[in-house]
Each structure stands twice: as structure tokens, then as C-alpha cells.
Amino acid sequence: MTLSFRTYQPAADGITPDTARLQQALDDLDAQGGGTLVVESGRYLLGGLRLPSNCCLQLDEGAELIASACYDDFAHTTTLSVAELSDRAFLYARQQRNITLCGKGKITGSADAYFSAQPDEQGYRLPAQHRPRIVVLEDCEQITIQDITIEHAPMWTVHLVSCRQVNVERLTVDNDMTMANTDALNLDSCQDVIVHDCHLSAADDALCIKTTAKPPAMQYKAQRMSVSHCRLRSRSCALKIGTETFADIEDLNVSHCTLYDSNRGIGLISRDGGAFRRICFSDITVECVTAPPCHWGKADPIFISVRYRDPTIEPGVIEQVRFVRITGVSEGAINLHSTPAGYVRDIHFEDITLTQQPGDSTEQGLYDVRPPCNPARPTGMGLDNAYLVNPDTGRAYGVEAYPGGMPALFARGINGLTLHNMTLQRPSPLPVGWNHDAIIELAE
């Protein structure tokens, strides 16, 4: 069955709310057993919408869904999952199946309404405490997201929580690069996922695989995911696994991706008890440049870290990870950190060609193990451990200088590190503050 939204006589002017009409169309589709709802060209101002099973929401070229600038307009799409203090979504479904979002149209998130107009001295635009996520699907299966564009999200853009059989193809996310915590695509405790040919650009993580805290019935492992032929851009980490890791993350394959104009390239960060196993990155190009100090990372092309967040929760190990045919340029170093020692193990690098280049940031020559690092708030989240300044160093807690200067690869507390056919190109003569040793390995 196919329905035309035009038959519901929407205002389509971008000013008059069309929420009730679009929800009615979705409900009518559901009552008929499902099908496709075609949203024709026009600008539709909307609050929260609930998506039913067996639904294809098709946005025609020229169609623009505009998320309301008022958080109260999402009260009826309150989510079970919470991201920071965000418990509402623009497009929402829970325990539904066979949902498709597709078409050449776009979704606009009205992000400016939820952020301060100007960044502070750390480069941080202060967000409102309550901001809607754009797409939140919880405990759903048979999900397809294809061809749509999402712009200017005020919070996490696409958050798939405990979903199975997910296919994301040719998704474009283009968020404001001054707005933190606007992750492009978050795969949270999802299983059997394919992400292919997407372009994801955000100030926060472009693509993040995680296992957040959630009710036990929804707390699955994240496993069996394939990511390929994507272009990723981020002021934080272009392709991140973690930091929220309350369940294991296993069997991931990432290949033929370009990580460009990003602060940190690939990040694996374990904090909350879940282990990482059997992960492979291959045929990836990176370009890492130093971002403003509020963002985690110092232009590291590859970053692996295990450390405690909550002193009562032992962090999970990171093991059986391979990096093969990684090439590119960076202003920082490869960083591998395990605290306690030995929680990062069996890490293999093969056919790596990286060029390290000088930058103009005063932060070059530092490394960053956030979060958490603020001793006054050891279990804190968000701003507590994002960018509070250590009065002893004048830098954010967790941002430290390399012993003896910046190398090309810095490893501390790693067991079973294998380096095969690595080419690390560095300027000659070395800039002031760079270590003459390209590779530094410390026991702890």
C-alpha cells in the first residue's frame, strides 16, 4: 500500500506545524497493515513522530522535515534510552520491525535553537540541557536507512539502540562542526549491521559503536557489524568504539573508509566493563588535524585506551585487534594506553604508512586519555570529564605531555604488540619538542 502525504493537506510551509497530519498518515498506514508513506516536496515543521512496523517513510527530493525548536514538542516521543539528559526523539520507534527511512529528501534538526551563539575560549558552544535526538529506534529489527540527508542535528543524529538486522546505505549526515555531542551515527548494542557508502560529518563522533547503560532486557552485545566505503569527518573521533561499554563489543570489520579533516581517526576506548574482541580495520585512509581543546584527542590517527571510569567497575579488555593497510597524515601520534597494564593485548599492525606533520596548535606534542581524568569527579560524565581544566597544568584533566617529546607511536602497558612493515615518516629536522625515537614502548 502507498499513501501520499499530500492527500492529508499539510501546510508544507515550514512555519505551520504539520505534526498531527503526518502522524495520522503513519497511523492510517499502520491500520492498513503497513506500506509506504510518500512525503512530497515541501517544508514540514514537525514535533515528535512515532513510526510503526512495516512502514517505509519515503522523502521525495525537495521534501524537508524540520524538527521543532521547542523541546516540549517531543514530549509524546519520550525514549527509554537517555543520552546525557536527552530522553526525546524526533522520529521514534520501540519494539517495531521492518522500518525503512529512504528517499532523496532531508531532515533538518534546528540545532541553532539549542546552542549558545558563540564558542568559549576552549572552542565549546554551550548546549541546552535538553535537546532531541533525530532518529531513535529501540529494540527494533529489520531496519533500513537509505539515501536520506540529515543536517544540523542538535543532539545525537541517528541512535539505534539494541536493534537487529540493520542496513544503512548512502546516509548523509552534515552537522555543524562547532556543536559537540551531535554524533552522526550511533550503533548501540546492535547486532548484524551493515553500514555502506555513507558520508558522516559531525563535531562529535561521526560513527560510534557502543553499549550504553540500559535496562537488562535491552542490554545486548554489539556484534557482527560491517562498515565499508564510508567517508567520515569529526572534531572528536571519526570512527569510535566506546567510550560507553557496559556490554561486550565483538566481531567488527571496517574497510575501505576515508577519515578526513578529523581530530582523532580510529578510537577504541574501554571504560565500563565490556570487552572488545575480534576487530579488524583495513584499507583505511586517515587525515588528522588538532581540534579545539574541548574535544577529546590530539590528532591521533589511532587511539586505544583502557582505564577505570567508576573505581568499582573493572574495565573490559581490548584484544585481537588488527590494523592492516592504514595510510595517511596526522599532526599527532598513534596512542596505545592500558591502565592497568595488560588490559590491551594482541594488537597487530601490518602495512602501515603514516606521515607525521607539524601543525600550528599549541596542543601539538600532547596526548589525551579523557575520559575520565578529573580526580574530584572520578565517575563524572559529560562536562565533568570533557574539558574541566587542571589548575596545575593549565590544560584539561587527562591531557599530558609525552615523556621526552612526541613520538610517532606511543604504547604504555600493552601486551602482545606486533608491528610489521610500518613506515612512519617524520619531518627532518624534527621540530622542537618531538622525540627522536619514533616508537616508544613503556611497560606501564
Where are these regions (language model features)?
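Extracellular/periplasmic carbohydrate-active domains that bind, remodel
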Residues: M1-E444
